[in-house]
Amino acid sequence: VNFSEFSKKCSERWKTMSAKEKGKFEDMAKADKARYEREMKTYIPPKGETKKKFKDPNAPKRPPSAFFLFCSEYRPKIKGEHPGLSIGDVAKKLGEMWNNTAADDKQPYEKKAAKLKEKYEKDIAAYRAKGKPDAAKKGVVKAEKSKKKKEEEDDEEDEEDEEEEEEEEDEDEEEDDDDE
């Protein structure tokens, strides 16, 4: 029995019930509502999940991964060969191509990604040192953080970076569409 059928049967049954029969369910609903209101008085929402961390637009951007470098090279070729493919289908095709690419053939992309990552790490260290004059004087680049908090921030940065990369891909694809 699917939900819509079940719901219809419940509705029909409710309409045929006497007030006395309905009273039992109404009492249960009132008791559940009272329990809910009691629990909500003491409920404290988890910190930091709803607030989005401020991201400085002047901060260095994270470098693309080897896969994204591969995609930026092969996307125009795929679009040229298959102009009717949707963005999602192009992405699937690129993913398949990457997975079928031999490790030796991935090497240039991985090397370039590693170089870009090194440059990013230097840039972000300089950026953080510049943003904190006291830390720069002492030679400290990163403030110490609890492991859990650091992991949460890293997860947020990764999500934001993925969103940025997707936006950049969309912009690149729009530019490619405009060129055609």
UniProtKB/Swiss-Prot annotation:
In the record, N6-acetyllysine modifications are located at 8, 55, 92-93, 106, 137-138, 142, 145, 147-150
Which regions are flagged for Acidic residues bias? 152-180
Q: Which GO terms describe its cellular component?
A: condensed chromosome; endoplasmic reticulum-Golgi intermediate compartment; endosome; extracellular region; nucleus; plasma membrane
Listed A to Z, the keywords are: Acetylation, Adaptive immunity, ADP-ribosylation, Autophagy, Cell membrane, Chemotaxis, Chromosome, Cytoplasm, Disulfide bond, DNA damage, DNA recombination, DNA repair, DNA-binding, Endosome, Immunity, Inflammatory response, Innate immunity, Isopeptide bond, Membrane, Nucleus, Oxidation, Phosphoprotein, Repeat, Secreted
Q: Which domain of life is it from?
A: Eukaryota
Q: Where is this region: LPS binding (Lipid A)?
A: 45-61
Primary place of residence?
Answer: nucleus
Q: Which residues carry this modification: Phosphoserine?
A: 65
Q: Where is this site: Cleavage?
A: 32-33
Answer yes or no on keyword Cytoplasm: yes
Sequence ranges of Basic and acidic residues compositional bias: 126-144
Question: How does the record say this protein sits in the membrane?
Answer: Peripheral membrane protein
The record places the DNA-binding region at 1-44, 60-128
Does the entry feature the keyword Cytoplasm, yes or no?
Answer: yes
Task: PTM ADP-ribosylserine: list the residues.
Answer: 146
Where does the motif Nuclear localization signal (NLS) 2 lie?
143-149
Q: Where is this region: Binding to AGER/RAGE?
A: 115-148
| UniProt PTM comment | Phosphorylated at serine residues. Phosphorylation in both NLS regions is required for cytoplasmic translocation followed by secretion. Acetylated on multiple sites upon stimulation with LPS. Acetylation on lysine residues in the nuclear localization signals (NLS 1 and NLS 2) leads to cytoplasmic localization and subsequent secretion.
Q: Where in the cell is it found?
A: Nucleus; Chromosome; Cytoplasm; Secreted
GO molecular function terms listed in the Swiss-Prot or TrEMBL record: DNA binding
Domain note for this entry?
HMG box 2 mediates pro-inflammatory cytokine-stimulating activity and binding to TLR4. However, not involved in mediating immunogenic activity in the context of apoptosis-induced immune tolerance.
Family, per the entry?
Belongs to the HMGB family.
| Family matches, as PANTHER family | HIGH MOBILITY GROUP PROTEIN B1 (PTHR48112:SF35), HIGH MOBILITY GROUP PROTEIN DSP1 (PTHR48112)
Summarize subunit and interaction data from the UniProt record for this chain. Interacts (fully reduced HMGB1) with CXCL12; probably in a 1:2 ratio involving two molecules of CXCL12, each interacting with one HMG box of HMGB1; inhibited by glycyrrhizin. Associates with the TLR4:LY96 receptor complex. Component of the RAG complex composed of core components RAG1 and RAG2, and associated component HMGB1 or HMGB2. Interacts (in cytoplasm upon starvation) with BECN1; inhibits the interaction of BECN1 and BCL2 leading to promotion of autophagy. Interacts with KPNA1; involved in nuclear import. Interacts with SREBF1, TLR2, TLR4, TLR9, PTPRZ1, APEX1, FEN1, POLB, TERT.
Q: What the protein does?
A: Multifunctional redox sensitive protein with various roles in different cellular compartments. In the nucleus is one of the major chromatin-associated non-histone proteins and acts as a DNA chaperone involved in replication, transcription, chromatin remodeling, V(D)J recombination, DNA repair and genome stability. Proposed to be an universal biosensor for nucleic acids. Promotes host inflammatory response to sterile and infectious signals and is involved in the coordination and integration of innate and adaptive immune responses.
Protein's name in the database:
High mobility group protein B1
Naturally occurring in which organism (per UniProt): Cricetulus griseus (Chinese hamster)
Q: What gene is this protein translated from?
A: HMGB1
